[in-house]
Amino acid sequence: MPLLHTLNTALAVGLLGARYYPEVQTFLGLPDYVGHMKNVVRSVFQGSGLVVVSSDTVGVRGTYSNRGQIGSSLGCILAVPDSGADIEIDLDRLVGTEEEATSCLVEAVGSTADVPRRRVRQKGRFAMHAVNAAKLHFCGVPKPTEANRLAVSKWLVQYCKERHVVDSHIRTIVNTALPRVFTPDAEDIQVVLDLHSVRAHDHRNALAEAGKVRKWWVNLAMHPMTGRSWSRAWRRLCRLPDDQAISFVRXGCLRELVGRETQISRGENPAMRVFPLANPPKVRRIFHICGMGNGLDFGVHNNSLNNLRRGLMERVFYVEDAQKQLKPAPQPIPGIFGKLSGIRRRLVRLAGNHTPVPREKYPSFYKGRRATIYQKALDSLHDRPVSRKDAELKTFVKAEKINFTAKKDPAPRVIQPRDPRYNIEVGKYLKPYEHHLYRAIDAMWGGPTVLKGYDVGELGNIMSNTWDKFRKTCAIGFDMKRFDQHVSVDALRWEHSVYNAGFNCPELAQLLTWQLTNKGVGRASDGFIKYQVDGCRMSGDVNTALGNCLLACSITKYLMKGIKCKLINNGDDCVLFFEADEVDRVRERLHHWIDFGFQCIAEEPQYELEKVEFCQMSPIFDGEGWVMVRNPRVSLSKDSYSTTQWANEKDAARWLAAIGECGLAIAGGVPVLQSYYSCLKRNFGPLAGDYKKKMQDVSFDSGFYRLSKNGMRGSKDVSQDARFSFYRGFGYTPDEQEALEEYYDNLQLLCEWDPTGYKEELSDRWILNEFPTTL
C-alpha cells in the first residue's frame, strides 16, 4: 500500500503538471488527452486510487478515475465518466461576468439512466469574483496583518449578503476566498516584476539624473573650454547664487482667503426694516495651512448687509419647503405641549427646588475676555436695574467655518445675543441649574442621556454600553431642521414652565417672558436691519443649550412611549437605540415631531456600532476601550482652516501647534488622526514658542477645544483592533491607513505665505476622498 500510495501521488503530480504544460503531456505519452488535461480542474487521492475530478473539455464533463491497474497504460486512467456527479470548481481560473457567476447552473453528468438530473450552484465562480472585487477594493494584495484579515473577512461577508447569498454558502465562499485575497496571483506578481524591471530602473535613474545640477567645479573640469563653465566659476568666486535644480512647492505653505458673499437674494419680510449705508462691506479673512486636508473648500461669510438680510430671511422668518419656496415655520398643534405635563412634573421632582446664586458670582463662570465683559455688565447693574431694553437683540453674521463643497451657497448663520446685563440676571438662576436638569433628564431616561461635559473616551463607552443594552440593536440618528427657528411661542412657554416650577420666583418669570417677543437690530459695516419676531430660540441666550436639550429629550420621551429605547442627546442632535424589530414603529413616530412644530430629519437605521454618528463623531474601539472619533473626511480639512487671524508666521505656528496638541488629546492611538495632529505639532511646535497660551484665547474656544480640555490620550501605538474598527467606521482599509500615516509622518510643512497663483496639491486626496463599497 505505501508503494501504491507513492505511485498514485506521483501520477497526481504528473497529471496536474500536464494541465499547465503540454510538454509534460507529451512526456507522459498523453497526446490523445491534451484537450482533457488542459481542462482538468482538480485531482483528489481516494482510497481506491487516483481520481482526476471534473474535466471541462467541451462535450465531456464529469468524474474520471483509475479503474484500471497501475501497471496498465496511462490511457486506462482516463476511463469513461462514472455515474456519480461530483462537481468541483476551478478557483484559479478567471471567469466571466458576475451575473454568470451568480446565476450559472450546471447539470450533473454521467449515466442519465441511473442518476437524476440536479442543479448545482457554482460557488467557486462566485468566490473568484469575490476575490477579484476584494483585491480591487483593497488596492491589490493586503498586507498579512490581523486588521487586514478582519477587514477582508468583513468585506467578503457583506459582499455576499448584498447579493443575497444564504449563510451556509457565505461561510464556504468566505473560507475559500479569504486566503486567495492574501495570495498574489500572476497579475499581482507581474505588477511587481514590472516595477522592478531593468527598464523601469533605467527610467527612474534617468529621471533622477536629469534633475541634478553638477557642482560648478565638476562642470568646469568636464567642460573647460565653454564660457558657461567659466561664468559659473566666476559667479561662485564673487559669492553670487549658483545654478540650482528647479523645485516646486507642493504642500505646506500658509494661505489667507477672503470671506464670501451670498449670491442669492430672498427679498425682505414686512417685519424687517433695512437701512443701507454708504460704507463698503467689511471683508473677513480665513487662514489655511496647505497640504493637510482632502481638498474640501472651507470659507467664512462676511458680516455684510447682503449676508445679514439672507440670514434673517432663511434662519429667522422663513423655512424652505420641498420646492425650495420660503414659507413660515410650521406651528404646533394647539394644546399639544399640554401632553408633556407629566414629563414636566417628573423632571421638576428629579431636579429639585433651587435658589439663584448671587449675581456677583456670575462673571466667575467664564474666563478671559468674556469674564471681563460680564464684570463690566455687573458694575452697570449697580447703577441701574435691568430693563426690557436689555433683552433686545444685537444681531450679526456668525464667523464660522463653512463647508462650501457640501453646499455651494448656504444661508449665512446669524448670532442674536442680548445685552450681558440681561444674561447675568437670567444666568444667576439657570447657569447653576443647568447641570441639575441634565441629570434629571438622565434619570428620566434611565442612564446618561445629555452628553455634555464628557471626554471622548467617556462618550465612546457610553455609546457602547447603551448599544449593549439590547439583544439586536438598531440605532437611528435624527435632528431637527433649523431647530432654533422652529422653537415656537408654545414651546418656549412650556420650557419656561419647567424653570419657573424649579425656582417659583416672579423675577425669573418676568425675565423669561421677554424671550417670547423679540426685537433686535442686525448690524453690518454697510448697513443695519431692525426687525421683530415672535418666538424662536435666540442663539445668544443663556438657556439656549439647556432649552434645546430639554425640548428634544422631553418630546422624544413622549413620542416613544411604549417602546423600549435609549436616547443620547446634545441639543438637537439625537441618536435613539432600540431593538431592531421596532424600527418601523420608531420611524413612524419620529414623523410626529411635526405635531410640536419641528421638522425631524431621520437618518438611515444602523446595525453596527461604528456606523452610528453623533455630533459628527463615531465610536471606534482602540484596543482598550471605545472612543468617539471625528469624521476624518471632514475634520482633516476643517482643522487646517482658522477663522482666528494669523498676524504673522509665528502667530500661525502657535495656532497650528495648539491644534496639534488638542488633537492628540482626543485622537491619540487613533489611526490616521494621530499622525495628522503629530505632523502639525512636529512642524510648528519648535517655531511657536509657548503656544499653549493660544488655547486660552476666547477666539480658540470651540467644540473641538472643549472636547480636548478633558482629553488625556496622547500619542501611543495604533493597535490592530483600532485599525479594523476604524475601517468599519469610516471605510479606510488598514493599508490605506498606513499609507496616510506614512504621508503625514514624513510631511514637511513650510511656515511661509503662499506664492501668487499657488494651487494646493494633495497627493493623499485620492485616498481621503474615496468612498468605498458599503460595508
From Swiss-Prot:
Name listed for the protein in its UniProt record: RNA-directed RNA polymerase
Effect of mutating D581E: In strain: Infectious clone UK
Job of this protein: RNA-dependent RNA polymerase that plays an essential role in the virus replication.
Additional note from the record: Readthrough of the terminator UAG occurs at position 251.
Entry EC number(s): 2.7.7.48
SUPFAM superfamilies named in the record: DNA/RNA polymerases (SSF56672)
The keyword Nucleotidyltransferase is annotated on this UniProt entry: yes
A Pfam family of this chain: RdRP_3
Result after altering D717N: In strain: Infectious clone UK
Disulphide bond pairs: none
GO process annotations (BP): viral RNA genome replication
Superkingdom of the source species: Viruses
Domain RdRp catalytic: 473-586
Phenotype when changing R345K: In strain: Infectious clone UK
Signal peptide per UniProt: none
Keywords carried by this UniProt record: Nucleotide-binding, Nucleotidyltransferase, RNA suppression of termination, RNA-directed RNA polymerase, Transferase, Viral RNA replication
InterPro entries reported for this sequence: DNA/RNA_pol_sf (IPR043502), Rev_trsase/Diguanyl_cyclase (IPR043128), RNA-dir_pol_PSvirus (IPR007094), RNA_pol_HCV (IPR002166)
Molecular function via GO: nucleotide binding; RNA binding; RNA-directed RNA polymerase activity
Reactions the enzyme catalyzes: RNA(n) + a ribonucleoside 5'-triphosphate = RNA(n+1) + diphosphate
